[in-house]
Amino acid sequence: MSNNSLLIKNANIVDGTGTEAFIGDVLVEDGVIKNVGNIDGEFETVIDANGLILAPGFIDIHTHFDPQLCWDGYATPSIEHGVTTVVTGNCSLSLAPIRN
């Protein structure tokens, strides 16, 4: 068993490549995806994701978070919906502070 290991089993995996989703497992060790497929072994944490979808973080290219980022720098509502990256200032106005 690896320390800091997480196995997500039986997930409906959408890998972001455009291929069909498939049922499989994802092994994460020390916060890094190490393997995707049918994985056996003992792991620190095992999550049975049967009936659930597992996908990479989504990118939201059109947001109006500019002012919100001044008080919520993590864009918390997006994280709660699977969005890990946002683009701001794409409406020709950005209220977010800009630093060198």
Predicted regions and their residues:
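Di-metal (Zn2+ and/or Mg2+/Mn2+) metal-binding site signature of metallo-dependent hydrolases
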Residues: 53-77
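N-terminal metal-binding scaffold of metallo-dependent hydrolase/deaminase domains
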Residues: 1-42
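Active-site metal-binding motif and surrounding structural segment of the metallo-beta-lactamase
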Residues: 40-57
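Divalent-metal coordination cores built from histidine and acidic residues
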Residues: 71-100
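Flexible loop/turn segments at secondary-structure boundaries
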Residues: 15, 66, 93-97
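Hydrophobic/aromatic beta-strand patches that form the interior of the parallel beta-sheet core
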Residues: 8, 45-47, 87
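Activation segment
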Residues: 17, 37, 67-69, 87
